[in-house]
Amino acid sequence: MNQSKNRPAMTWMFSLLAATAVLGGCATVETRPTAAVNASNPLVAQAGHLARNNADLSGAQRTENERQIERLLSQLDNAALAREAEALPVGDPLYNFVGRQLMQRGLPLPRPFDQTSNWRYQASAQRPPADSDGYRPPLKLAVLLPLSGSLATAAAPVRDGLLAGYYGETRRRPEIIFYDTNGTAGGTLAAYDKAAAEGNDFVVGPLGRDEVSALFGKDALPVPVLALNRGNVAPPSGTVSFSLTPEDEGVAAADYLLERKALRVLAIGGGDDSQRRAIAALKERLGARGAQVTDTIGEGTADLAPFASKEGGIDAVFLAVKGSAARGLIPKLALAGLADKPRVATSQLLSGTGKPEQDRVLDGIAFPSESWTSGGVRGLPPAPGVAAGLPTARGPAARLFAFGYDAWLLSAYLERLAGRSDAFVAGATGVLRVDGFGSVLRTPAWSTFSSGVAVPLADASRR
């Protein structure tokens, strides 16, 4: 059921990673100043009423109530949102909603999130005090992953990325034990119970959405958890969820476009589930901020002119497609008069690319990427060098490798992130923060194509 860290084949590899890291293991945790102002707004009064009733709701009713709160707050401009946050007293149920909006917009919080009876995080008192940068890892770390079963292929790069962070750290490290969930709800619950019984003081995992939902639905979770996916219920108190989901990319794309004043967006997508989910998230986020998706059309649509010529025009195009499909769409966008409009895609754009002579047509399209693969991250050797020696860090797996590395960082810095208004970690997947509801908010790096090669996007917002 479990695997100890003493695996020779892994140890030498990650010892090598530790030795080659320029600044091994030191994450960047920074602070930003805040300003104090006071104001009030009727939209906030309505949102506050909903927030006060939120704790009494559950399931779909609670989800819809929270969406209504988000929609109301999204109508406030940045200055008004900041003023209202400053005016809310400690313990007001609305503060965590307002704070999350501020965080999503890259704005400072006036104070830390309120840790309420619904959600709070507290590290084990037995841990040694935190270092000056907030580093305070567990004493004994359990990692719950599907090391066998249908998700084992996805779990391998997550495991290796986590171990790269672990072996690259030169300060105190916890004992680490891997538990196989078999990729099932039952296997997850059994693995968690075993990890708790064996004295682990923190759990990373599980990985699958159904596994996370099963764990979050458990009556009691005596050991805090960093789940590596979103469940179908909110994280229970003491647990945090971190994920790389299509919804996250849709939201990131919406925020990117909103920052560039794009209010009317044409969405083009393929047929798979992740592409549909990204578009749905984009549409919801734009709608909440007063913008809109004018049409959602399939990647095989022959003539885009009728959609481009609608009254009000098109400000930008969102592409939830793979690179091969995007190459066929670019000439159609030009024929429809949309060649000069901002174009944003999901990270799937990279799929099916790699030949610059073919990919030049993709030049200028912005897409979310990982800090590590797009420009490097402190604490990890450059991605090409790691990929040369480690198959689980190559190609599409590099994203999951970076995800695993960040899971290690979060396990070590979570207390700092949950307890300070100005704390963030510069991770391998992007800039990481924790909101007042137990969710890790990730601001991705951004990339584009130049001469057919993916490169960092210099003018993208990196809040």
Where are these regions (language model features)?
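An alpha-beta-alpha
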Residues: T239-I297
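Extracellular/periplasmic periplasmic-binding protein-like sensory domains
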Residues: G287, I314, I330-Y405, G419
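Segments of small-molecule ligand-sensing domains
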Residues: A383-A458
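C-terminal motif of bacterial Sec signal peptides marking the signal peptidase cleavage site
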Residues: V22-G25
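Periplasmic-binding protein-like
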Residues: A195-G208, L226-L228, R264-G269, G312-A326, ...
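Beta-alpha junction/loop-to-helix N-cap segments that form part of ligand/metal-binding clefts
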Residues: T153-P157, G168, R172-V233
